[in-house]
A protein has these predicted regions:
Chain A
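An alpha-beta-alpha
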Residues: 47, 139-192, 317, 338
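Short, well-structured alpha-helical segments in soluble
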Residues: 71-88, 105, 205-224
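Hydrophobic alpha-helical segments within soluble ligand-binding/sensing domains
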Residues: 134-160, 210-213, 280-289, 304-321
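Periplasmic-binding protein-like
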Residues: 31-34, 85-96, 113-118, 159-160, ...
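Extracellular/periplasmic periplasmic-binding protein-like sensory domains
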Residues: 184-190, 237-322
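Flexible loop/hinge segments that line or gate small-molecule binding clefts
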Residues: 106-137
Length: 373, 346, 554, 376
């Protein structure tokens, strides 16, 4: 009897839910999926910018902070967007694990939706087969360019921090191998160091603390002309601080962007006129680095990659839906990317899938205390 | 005399002997591979100093009979709020550090009291409920960090210009104030008198507390609630006091941790804060019913030294990084060992 | 209370004569058992006929439980060196090494504490772990009896039959949780008689927790079972019940059989005398300057009600003379232990207690302690001591909490944060160790490692640290060896004489009460049955404990 | 619990005749979450077809995992956080099947066959550990899960490819040791769901998967009606009494753990075939957490849980999970706050449910005492 009453209530609820719902719509919508700011501010703000620009046309949802464990939620968020018949394109940045599964599920009911991914975490070949278009910084190229930049900045050694979970990602593992090769070619000693996994049970603080302790040790051992690099986002702040304190070289973050790591590490003051103003932020970082004696040893890309990727993806999605371009048109894609970035970009396809739309991008670097801001 | 000897052996215990042995192997390896042993020891001491008070926060709850404080994130969050207010107000250096504590402690007292009221109503499930209360309060605070009316331009996000950054640099405020205070060197080992002294000071304070009338009442309530009742002690109140004390220590602990670390970590960072502290005190030989300051010191030293040295040393010797996984297995294995060993507790 | 003997008793008596000729179903011959050198049973024999109710009576510690433990092959017997003597069932010698073997041999036991699962139905409890099952496809496939279905209809049928034998009309599928205590007792019995092989049933104080009507029904069932041919061994304190149902009565005292009576030879007075009677070596107690009298009352208890499970006090009134040692006696379960526990605030209590005319608020240990009352609990290890803490902490902590003793004097305004004065406490503990002759390694020794007698002395020292005017002592000699018993009793007398402490001593051992007390109050069913001088006759004590005399014997 | 006609009669006569107060009191938790779900669904404004689809998919995907918790609760061991061990066994089996390239339903069944002995052995070990931590099973099983996770990582990151032979380059990391972080389970993806999946008014129902879950309900019901089921329940109520009555308590508890772990392993396989990809090092981590949350939302306590509560719990919990991020987003106007709100709800659910149950237990005990005093 009691069970019956509860059962009845559940049914009543589901029926009432049907009654409650009902949506009016513009011509079409684009869904954006990003993490929270604590996972990375760039992509979140990119989505906010698009929301501000296009208003109701954009539906912005979030994947969980501990996306590694909560795949189901990521999938639900993506399929949730696809459930809206007006949604014609979905942008996922970063494309965390679960995205491929979600796309497959959506395809079964909504084959018309196009998926544009930024920074996919899953196997590139798998992603290339599933998504309509993917962007990733060109890890293999960066394997070469970062080491070259380090050399240019005066590095004699190259230190690469990572941990098992990241080295279980084929692209990152491959990049490390390429870096090693390139370093050897340039006569630089390549050092691979293991750090604790920030997704492990002692979390981000444990990983960051390790970096703070380990960098002085390494600098003492190998000397100041050592370039520091880490595959993990949360390690960038301690890495930058340690590099500044010890006088080491920091050629590029894992995800190249002026807003990634630098503002927090430098304790940058964000005044009202600086908000979202990339050139102003770059200049402020430059001033801070120079002031702290890091001139000519720190560099990054002039654009926040994930920030601009969201914008580029949305524009590409719009133009594709409206029939103004083809996703496989590399030049058209590049044009929109450069428009969003307002700096020149290099773009190529994933070598393993020359006929897929998995694009790899690289940008030039700016060196603080050397270039003009 | 033999009794004493037996007692000492029992005090040290097999797990501690094992870890100490493992550490010895690590240091020998470090020496052979040409790593700077004094440097490793200095780093370990910093870790001990920065984590010690968080471990110490376990003592009051164990002593008053509530068990391990899985709700430690509550106190940590109070500490973070205190630390933030101090930054927002622009306090710098030692005043900033003490202002952070001054803001955090009253908050921790209130939160600790409310937490104790909750735990009182879920007697027998304290550890489970504590774990989840800790988790969910972290999520609530995530919303707070995003919405909180902090205006200091050094604290807010770069592009959005609102909400608190996930990592706040303390360098310009009270970063390392303790670490850089009264630093001296013995045999090449750099020791921060400020940091270690502060930790030992708190050990002493807690030790003295358990020698006061109130502290003894709390110990009694934890050791045997019926005895305590018959001695005119209000057992419920003692539990309250113990939980409040633990929360306050956690709040102070995270501020010490943060100043040493150089950052305030917001958002999901406090989620798992309780686990290393719990592992440390259990490794130190505490049980679910009884914990002493000595357990805290031994546990913190062993556990943090293990964490600090195992990774850099082993990654020199073996390619790959089995040490990261080994650490996972050892620390959880220790907690498991403690849970399956301590008898009599219901 | 007057006892009306049922008519059919005569019939049973008639039968008992015939039974003499029947085969004995159980014989225990010459049973002797020692625990660590203490003889607890000495050459005890008992036998049982089918259809007989044999009552086994005796004070606490007379050896009843040990005898039953032997009968049930309890591990505790074999792990402590076994016993001598033999057990025969149906005339054949058996060696029962475990309860399971005893069960197989046809011995059933109705436990004192209920072995019932509250979430199960009556049927499920009756058939617990003896469920009839039926095979199904899976159980055949895996050849596992574990996967057999429960045969619920058969279970219910069996349970119904067992309940019917007890004339219990309750629904056999009702859950046990929420049943009145009396029913639970019957379900325990039903479980035993449902075992087809059971021929001997042991009832261990079955009526202790029952109301009078429930007890009457239980006795009724006992007769019914006996009439079915089951031999019943009935252990109890309540002599009226013995008189009501028993065919034969065996009286144990100090581990020896003191008497075996047939129903027709027995009178309550005689049994009571046999139970408690022992040569009381009357020691001359030191005299006092001024003997206590009713003129000078230290403590007045008026209509005290204490909700202490198993030891309920139901409206007791009593006056305690200043400077006396007042004994409180009575059989287990009648509430003698509840008095001190209630007054000291350990169990919910109501009524009026006043010391020197000043009212003592109940339900607060702190109030009682701070008014000069102290208590040595009967539950030494549970309530009395912090087993893992050292002796000095145990002795000092109560006085420290209640009277701020053993504390440094600073800070004045915040006594809660005053530091413990280790030196003072240590000195006091050492003084106590010397005065009470506590055998230990020093004040630092954890009390867990002390012997029972020395632990008891620590408990007394703890109470003395409070410098009480009135001291409650419950079961001061329980579980300690003979030598230590004397020391503890001497200590109490010395306290009383030298320090003029009024002592209220509760004990199950009437002998020790009579040895040291000025007066002995007997509690029956939660109320005062009467007060006797220590030199009153055994019969008087026995009768009063059995509730057979009215109040105001003194 | 087995019910007889009389029992039902007693119940309906006494307290179930639509006595709303009684219903609210005994089902406080599910009713609270039902109300929460309705409110949030209203706020979130999702399309009903989507909501139904999502809830049914999640029901099919998760109900087996939640059901795996029932037996340990029955045996008095509380909520078994160590079902993650079962999930790990399942993942090992899924990796093996992918390696061997067995496709479709037969691949799924092979994985089940393979996972069963693995889960039985690990479950037995877990039972042995928990027998040494009586009274603290829950927190111990949680830590046991963390510990097992370490062992799992050791095996799949370091031993596979080095000690354990493994001949698929595409699943291994570039350096040849350790499994990649994502494994594409294309062979068994949706193998069960795809068998028959009719669309009824826009809602796709994976009939076979749902039937598997319901089948498990039947199996559990069957188990609880057998002799072993009776033993489990007896041990669950009072270990000491059960021991005195001759039930082998430790053995029974180990059996409970084995059953739970094996069902959890099957549950994880159902989950994985639905998702279609395996997150090698993380898919299992939250299995215990979420399953337990679902069971608690259904009104179960740490001492009592029924099949009905498990099923209702899955529906309510996942409805809440689907609607709460959007509801949070709408309420606060900021997407990421919605996400944190959801996390708060997920963890808060368990804390609140545990608190309500502990409180109810105390109330009941108080009442029992009061009654006992009154009858005196």
């Amino acid at each position: 009897m009691r069970k019956f009453v509860i059962g009845l209530l559940v049914v009543a609820f589901l029926v009432s839910a049907i009654g409650v719902v009902g949506t009016a719509a513009p011509a079409y919508k684009i869904g954006i999926v990003t993490g929270t700011v604590s996972q990375g501010e760039d992509e979140y703000r990119g989505a906010e910018k698009m929301k501000a620009k296009y208003g109701d046309m954009i539906k912005h949802v979030i994947y969980p902070d501990n996306f590694m464990q909560e795949q189901e939620t990521t999938i639900a968020q993506i399929t949730g967007l696809a459930a809206d018949p007006d949604v014609k394109a979905i942008v996922v940045n970063q494309a965390v694990p679960g995205t491929v599964a979600a796309i497959r599920q959506v395809r079964e009911i909504r084959p018309d939706i196009i998926f544009l991914l930024g920074v996919p975490h899953e196997d590139p070949e798998l992603v290339s087969d599933t998504a309509d278009l993917s962007f990733e910084t060109d890890q293999e190229r960066r394997g070469v360019t970062i080491v070259q930049l380090a050399k240019e900045l005066g590095a004699e050694k190259f230190l690469h921090y990572s941990f098992p979970r990241h080295m279980a990602m084929p692209l990152l593992a491959k990049r490390a191998d390429i870096m090693k090769e390139e370093a050897e070619r340039l006569g630089i000693e390549f050092i691979f160091a293991t750090a604790p996994d920030p997704m492990g049970e002692y979390g981000i603080p444990g990983a960051q603390q390790f970096i703070l302790e380990d960098v002085p040790r390494q600098v003492e051992k190998y000397g100041k002309n050592i370039a520091l690099f880490s595959t993990n986002c949360s390690m960038q702040e301690p890495l930058i601080i340690s590099a500044l304190n010890t006088g080491a070289i920091f050629p590029e973050q894992c995800c190249p962007s002026p807003t990634h790591g630098y503002p927090a590490a430098l304790g940058l003051e964000i005044t009202d006129e600086m908000k979202g103003n990339i050139p102003a932020i770059l200049k402020a970082i430059n001033d801070a680095i120079v002031e702290k004696g890091g001139a000519g040893r720190f560099a990054t890309w002039p654009v926040p990659t994930n920030y601009l990727l969201v914008e580029a993806c949305v524009e590409i999605a719009r133009d594709t839906i409206e029939g103004k371009m083809e996703l496989s048109d590399l030049d058209a894609v590049k044009a929109r990317l450069e428009a969003a970035a307002s700096v020149p970009m290099e773009l190529r396809r994933l070598p393993e899938k020359p006929d897929g739309n998995f694009y790899l991008l690289t940008s030039g670097s700016v060196v603080f205390g050397r270039d003009e801001f | 005399m033999t009794d004493k000897l037996k007692q000492t052996v029992e005090h040290i215990g097999i797990p501690r002997l094992m870890i100490a042995g493992f550490l010895a192997v690590i240091f020998v390896t470090a020496y052979i591979t040409g790593m700077s042993v004094p440097q490793l020891l200095s780093d370990s001491l910093v870790r001990v100093g920065m984590n010690g008070i968080l471990v110490l926060a376990m003592v009051p709850t164990i002593s008053c009979g509530v068990g391990l404080n899985f709700g430690l994130p509550l106190g940590v969050l109070c500490g973070l709020v205190g630390g933030l207010i101090s930054m927002e107000r622009g306090f710098v250096g030692f005043p900033g550090f003490f202002a952070a504590i001054a803001f955090a402690v009253p908050l921790a007292v209130v939160v600790g009291y409310l937490y104790s009221v909750l735990l009182e109503s879920v007697k027998g499930q304290e550890m489970m409920v504590g774990t989840y209360v800790g988790f969910s309060s972290v999520a609530v605070m995530c919303i707070f960090w995003l919405m909180a009316p902090f205006r200091n331009p050094e604290l807010i996000w770069a592009i959005g210009g609102k909400g608190l950054r996930s990592t706040l640099t303390l360098g310009n405020y009270y970063g390392k104030v303790l670490n850089n205070f009264a630093v001296f060197e013995i045999f090449g080992i750099k020791i921060s008198g400020g940091l270690i002294g502060f930790f030992l000071l708190f050990c002493l304070l807690v030790y003295l507390f358990f020698r006061t009338k109130l502290g003894i009442a709390m110990l009694t309530a934890g050791a045997n609630p019926v005895f305590a009742k018959s001695a005119g002690i209000d057992v419920r109140r003692m539990k309250s006091v113990g939980i409040i004390a633990s929360t306050v220590l956690a709040a102070i602990g995270i501020i010490v941790y943060a100043q040493s670390y150089g950052f305030l970590q917001l958002y999901m960072a406090p989620l798992m804060m309780a686990f290393p502290a719990i592992a440390a005190i259990l490794i130190g030989g505490a049980s679910l019913q009884r914990a002493t300051i000595l357990n805290v010191i031994i546990g913190t030293v062993l556990f943090q030294t293990l964490l600090t040295t195992a990774l850099p040393v082993t990654s020199r010797v073996i390619q790959g990084d089995i040490s990261e996984v080994a650490r996972l297995i050892i620390s959880n294995g220790m907690i498991l060992y403690a849970l399956t060993r301590s008898t009599g507790g219901k | 209370m007057l006892l009306v003997l049922p008519v059919e008793l005569v019939l049973i008596e008639g039968k008992s004569k015939n039974m003499e000729r029947a085969r004995r179903v159980l014989e225990m011959k010459g049973i002797t058992k020692q625990y660590f050198g203490n003889t607890v049973l000495n050459n005890v024999s008992i036998d049982l006929y089918p259809g007989e109710i044999h009552a086994l009576v005796g004070e606490n510690g007379a050896g009843k439980s040990t005898l039953m433990n032997i009968l049930f092959g309890m591990p505790v017997i074999h792990s402590t060196g076994g016993f001598s003597g033999e057990v025969l069932i149906d005339g054949e010698k058996v060696e029962l090494m475990s309860p399971a073997e005893a069960m197989q041999a046809g011995i059933g036991m109705v436990h004192q504490e209920f072995m019932l699962l509250p979430g199960f139905t009556i049927t499920e409890n009756i058939k617990l772990n003896r469920e009839p099952t039926t095979k199904n496809a899976l159980s055949r496939l895996f050849r596992s009896k574990s996967l057999d279905y429960l045969d619920v209809p058969t279970m219910r049928k069996d349970a119904r039959a067992a309940l019917d034998r007890l004339d219990l009309a309750i629904d056999e599928w009702a859950p046990v949780a929420g049943l009145p205590v009396g029913y639970m007792q019957f379900i325990e019995i039903a479980r035993e008689i449902d075992k087809k092989e059971v021929r001997i049933l042991v009832f261990d104080e079955p009526t202790a927790v029952l109301t009078e009507t429930e007890a009457d029904r239980l006795l009724e069932s006992l007769r019914r079972l006996a009439a079915d041919g089951i031999a019943i061994l009935f252990i109890t304190h309540r002599l009226d019940e013995v008189m009501a149902v028993a065919n034969r009565i065996t009286v144990l005292r100090d581990g020896e059989t003191v008497a075996r009576l047939n129903r027709d030879e027995a009178v309550v007075e005689r049994i009571a005398e046999l139970m408690v009677g022992r040569k009381v070596e009357k020691v001359e107690l030191p005299p006092r300057a001024k003997e206590p009298s009713d003129e000078d009352i230290a403590l007045t208890i008026d209509n005290l009600v204490v909700d202490m499970p198993g030891e309920m006090v139901r409206g007791l009134s009593l006056s305690v003379r200043r400077g006396e040692i007042l004994g409180i006696g009575g059989l287990a379960g009648h509430g003698k232990l509840g008095i001190a526990n209630g007054i000291m605030g350990l169990y919910p209590a109501s009524g009026r207690v006043s010391k020197n005319g000043e009212n003592i608020p109940l339900n607060s240990p702190e109030e009682a302690l701070s008014r000069g009352l102290a208590f040595v609990s009967e539950d030494r290890r549970g309530v009395g001591l912090l087993l893992n803490e050292p002796i000095d902490r145990n002795i000092g902590v109560t006085a420290m909490q209640v009277q701020h003793k053993f504390l440094k004097s600073w800070p004045h305004f915040l006594p809660a944060l005053r530091l413990e004065d280790r030196a003072e406490l240590r000195a006091y503990a050492e003084d106590m160790i010397r005065k009470l002759d506590i055998r230990c390694l020093g004040p630092n020794q954890p009390v867990r490692s002390l012997s029972g007698g020395n632990q008891q002395k620590v408990c007394i020292a703890k109470a003395l640290a409070l410098e009480p005017e009135i001291l409650f002592v419950s079961e001061p000699t329980r579980g300690i060896d003979v030598g230590a018993k004397r020391l503890v009793l001497d200590l109490l007398v010395r306290l009383n004489r030298d320090h003029n402490v009024t002592i209220i001593m509760t004990s199950s051992e009437l002998g020790e009460l009579r040895k040291v007390c000025d007066r002995v109050a007997i509690v029956y069913r939660g109320r005062l049955a009467g007060i006797l001088p220590p030199d009153a006759s055994d019969a008087e004590f026995g009768l009063m404990m059995a509730g057979r005399v009215g109040k105001e014997a003194v | 619990m087995i019910q007889s006609p009389e029992q039902k009669k007693v119940e309906s006569g006494r307290d179930v005749s639509l006595d709303m107060r009684h219903i609210v009191r005994t089902n406080g938790v599910p009713i609270l979450f039902l109300a929460l779900s309705i409110t949030m669904a209203a706020v979130a404004g999702l399309s009903p077809a989507f909501l139904m689809n999502e809830v049914i998919t999640r029901f099919a995907r998760n109900s087996l995992l939640v059901l795996s918790l029932l037996i340990p609760v029955t045996a008095g061991m509380g909520l078994n956080f160590s079902i993650v061990i079962g999930a790990m066994s399942a993942q090992a089996a899924a990796i093996a099947v992918t390696l061997w390239g067995i496709k479709g339903v037969s691949g799924f069944l092979t994985a089940c066959l393979l996972a069963t002995p693995l889960a039985a052995i690990t479950g037995c070990l877990a039972g042995l550990v928990l027998n040494r931590a009586k009274g603290r099973e829950m927190i111990t099983s949680m830590i046991l899960g963390f510990f097992a996770n370490g062992i799992y990582q050791l095996i799949f990151l370091f031993l596979v490819g080095s000690v354990i032979p493994f001949n698929s380059k595409s699943m291994l990391l570039p350096q040849g040791v350790g499994v990649r972080n994502t494994v594409d389970l294309i062979n068994i993806a949706q193998s069960l769901d795809k068998i028959w999946r009719p669309v009824i008014s826009g809602v796709r129902i994976p009939v076979v998967t749902v039937l598997v879950s319901l089948g498990m309900c039947v199996v559990i019901t069957f188990l609880l009606r057998t002799k072993i089921g009776q033993d489990l329940r007896a041990v669950g109520q009072d270990m000491n009494i059960a021991e005195v009555m001759g039930i082998k308590v430790d053995k029974t508890r180990i059996i409970a753990m084995i059953l739970s772990t094996v069902i959890a392993a099957w549950g994880q396989l159902v989950f994985l075939q639905n998702i279609g990809t395996l997150n090698t090092y993380n898919s299992h981590e939250q299995v215990g957490m979420f399953s337990i949350a679902a069971l608690l939302v259904g009104g179960a306590s740490t001492r009592r849980a029924t099949i009905f509560q498990a099923l209702i719990g899955v529906i309510l919990f996942h409805t809440l999970f689907v609607v709460s991020p959007l509801a949070g987003q709408k309420l606060f106007g900021v997407p990421q706050i919605g996400e944190y709100f959801r996390v708060f709800v997920a963890y808060g659910i368990i804390a609140v449910a545990l608190a309500i149950h502990a409180w109810q237990d105390r109330q009941m005990r108080k009442e029992a005492i009061r009654e006992a005093v009154l009858t005196e």
